[in-house]
Amino acid sequence: MPEAPPLAGLRVLEGAGSLAATYAGFLLSEIGAEVVKVETAGVARQTPGEHVLARGKRSIALDASGWRALLGHVDAVLTDDSVPPPDPDPDLVRCRVFAWGRTDSRLPPEESLLAAATGVQALQWSWSRCPVWLVTPMIGYMTGILAALGVSAAFFARHRGAPGQAVDVSGVCGALALNSGTFVSGAGHRGSLSLGGDPRGVYPTYGLYPTADGWLFVGALTQVFWTKLLTALNRLDLLAHPHLQGEPMTFFDADVRALVRAELEPVFATRSTVAWVEALRAADVPCGAVGSRADFLRDPEARALGLAVPVEDPVLGPTWQPAAPVVFSDTPAPPPRPAPLPGGDTAAVLAEAPSWRRRFRASSGDGPRACLEGIRVLDLTSFIAGPFCPLLLAELGADVVKIEAPGGDPFRFQLFGFVGWNRGKRSLVLDLKRAAGREAFLDLVRAADVVVDNFRPGVMERLDIGRDRLARLNPRLVHTSITGYGSSGPLAALPGFDPIFQARSGLTVAQGGDDAPVLHMIAYNDYSAGALGALATVAALVARERTGRGQHVDVSLFRTAFAAQAAQMILFPGRPPDPRGGRDYLGPAASHRLYACLDGWLCVAAGSAAETAALGRLAGIPLTLDDPPDGPAAGALAQVLAGSPRADALARLAAAGVPAAPALAAAEIFGAPWLRASGCLGALSHPTLGPLQVVGPFIHLEATPATLGRPAPLLGADRASVLGELGYDAAQIAALVEAGAVG
């Protein structure tokens, strides 16, 4: 009989209405916590997505006295901007999820304003080099994952003697987390991934192409995949082209991009999307069909793998919804339960609550200085999704050792990006193809708590360090794998990159609207999978405190693509459409739109009739909430704002009571005083790059604070300290280096 889910026995009270906070509650429920949601009885949920996010929770109606009484019986509470934070309690984890965090901003908790003020809109690739209004609330989702991670880490720390504590997670930090590899500033560098970006993809070998009947994403990011692609297209002649002699990730120049597209577009236009997917998969080229969210939920491959599951909702009837966000080998997630009726569990919960006992209570001894203090993590990952997971674990206090092949992480060439994804870690080079390198790795495993890998399934087994062997060697080991299509199943061997799942999951179609699909500059599925991997790893550590055993944790980009758009991922007859964007999309209405000023852009988000009327007075024309983004009212306002410096325009809007924020460029992020007040910007000194400004830490914990940690390591810089801690002396280490087993 399987064990109970990782967070079984822990109770969370959710008093919040924002996407970020309710998504955090959804995730905690999905990994086993009993989440009690406070709602107004008899008031229908406003959107289909609310039925997904309320799934698995219990719903109660409470007045203020009932709220205070219930706080004394739960382990954690989730609140947002709409609810005052609860009083301190030595046994209670108090998580506040709020938009602007520790800044002094008085703006409403609007995703669009956050996206503007944190550089997210300005970074998005566009045809006209303007900022872009993003239709999918990626910031809210990432903030929710970080909040769930903070609560789980605080649970783990409390079990080890830490008190209950305040956990603060802001939308500002959520936005910056989604750009941890982009927002790195040093001498001569202020982030370049967005410069010259193409909405079809920054590299021509790694982008969207029209086919005979639709669109296709092709992911030939590396030289190996580029050669396989050209072989499949019968265009190996391009390997000899004088302008295409570098790695595909060097094909950044506009002329080179145009050259490659001119050669490839006519080829892809000759066949259907389905035919190309079949042919490219057979050639081991990463690829994916572009489709809608409804297509994704109907996808036969997704349903066969159990990633889209049927749920009978008491209001909506038969629906298809996302499966659990992650898979635990030994403590499986509970099967999905439909959303309760608002307030439907009030009587039962109030009857049970007096008998509830908190799982952990604060001890009188000294607790850990950080949530994961004393936890050793072996990081075998590369690129983005993999490294982001142990980065978050390092922020929470884990000792992370990045184990690299002799050539290093392939993304080391992304110098500042690598720094952003790999701070807080030490580096050890091991050649796992050599027996002596494997033995050194196995010695590390014996003393480790966690291994994180993002190899394709089968690679570790071929190296004789597969999960079964590691589990026998260290039964307490938590082994987290982050893959494209999962660790098992008929698709497991396929290569997977973030944009494949942007394309398949409807993300690109939603942003492009009736125009061409649009790739997001933010590697959204990568970052989400890494953050969900960190959450699942900590949850597995919590479970280990109960079971005494580790387990395997399976995170995939395919599964993440459902979970990271959970509120949009619901299918039922008559489902209303989600918002859609368009070409260089500026916003859905004149009152919710990006506008150009003399020296930059700003974002307006008037949410009431009064605010919209005030906006109209500035424009000198009547304006309503229904006025379109390209109508006369929007044109009049655009003309007024275009003649003003941005600071003056923002001051006029603020004086009129209209919410607005600057659409900051990447170069402006570290110079914004209010962003520095958020606590999510920091400084490090790198051994070769010198002083750097970076983003993080992303979660603020009162009693066991998170930290930026050390700068990203040089390749193999820590071999003496890491191996020395295992008892290797200098002569042994030198012999391993001489043999090529250690770098």
How would you label these PLM feature ranges?
Residues 34-38, 281-296, 356, 400, ...:
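Short, well-structured beta-strand/strand-turn elements
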Residues 1-11, 193-194, 210-211, 291-379, ...:
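Terminal low-complexity tails and localization/encapsulation signals of metabolic enzymes
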Residues 1-163, 311-312, 337, 341-552, ...:
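N-terminal helix-loop segment corresponding to the beta1-alpha1 unit
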Residues 137-152, 171-179, 221, 225-228, ...:
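Mid-domain beta-loop-alpha active-site segment that forms a flexible
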Residues 76, 205-283, 287, 294, ...:
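Aromatic-enriched alpha-helical interface/lid elements that frame and gate functional surfaces
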Residues 131-142, 164-166, 196-200, 204, ...:
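A short glycine-threonine-serine/GTX helix/turn-capping micro-motif
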Residues 45-46, 199-202, 319, 412-414, ...:
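Short solvent-exposed loop/turn micro-motifs enriched in small/polar/acidic residues
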Residues 154-197, 276, 292-293, 540-582, ...:
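Substrate-binding/catalytic subdomain of NAD(P)-dependent oxidoreductase enzymes
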